[in-house]
Amino acid sequence: MIYKNNDFKFFKEFKVNVDSKKNNEEVIIKLPEYFDHFYDENIKRIKEYIFCKKIDYRILGFKSSVNTKENFCKMLEEIEIYIKEIYKKYKKVYVVGISKGGIINCLLYNKLMKNSNIKFINISTPYKGTIFADPEAVKKRLEERKIPFRRSIYNTYFKIYDGNFPDQMIQQNSDILKEVKYNSKIINFVAKATFSSFLKDLFSLNVESAFLYLIDKALRIKGDGIVSIDSQTRNYKKDIKIKATHKMSYIIAIKKIVIL
């Protein structure tokens, strides 16, 4: 497994499995979901996106400069140019948006849709936002539900909350979400944390994912532990429903699309 990373002005690229000697014909481009420092500090998390040696992977992370709507829009332009260069090198390109990355995918789609070798996939996308992008909303829900140790839970949540523009973007009723136009040709996965997925996570010692199931039930998210089903849903007939938490939705969804 080969790790390389390249810096752009508004995002950072982590190349995985990219080897000129292999000449892989397919590539997965994962749009920004986290800031680059998250991946720098958690190389293990990058490995979780890899499931096939015959595919190249390019994981993108926000740069800290994406702190305003203006810079967010500049990042979109930069990613558009980047993807147009990438698809020249591969027979098939999967542009994947997980969580807030799905919003980015919607904003990029109209500019890239003419390229027939690109497949657009959204997973666990908060089209209507999520309370976890708003500390006050989380605090209010904890109080309403009278969750035990709610102060400790809130303090832990607040430590990992970035609060930068990408988080503000997916707050419920944000201006950006109102501007997003969804196209039904984007493959949309809706994830629901179920008891069976919880048991599977427990047996595989996936504590983080199992915890999301408990959070989903305790806070009545009614979704994947982070995003409600209502917020993820775009097209009732075409949406693909999967049993998974927010953390596990990518690997389950992408294996249904990529033909190995």
Roles of regions detected by a PLM:
Residues I2-Y3, V18-K91:
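Active-site catalytic motif of lipid deacylating hydrolases and related acyltransferases
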Residues N110-L260:
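Helical cap/lid subdomain of alpha/beta-hydrolase-fold lipid enzymes
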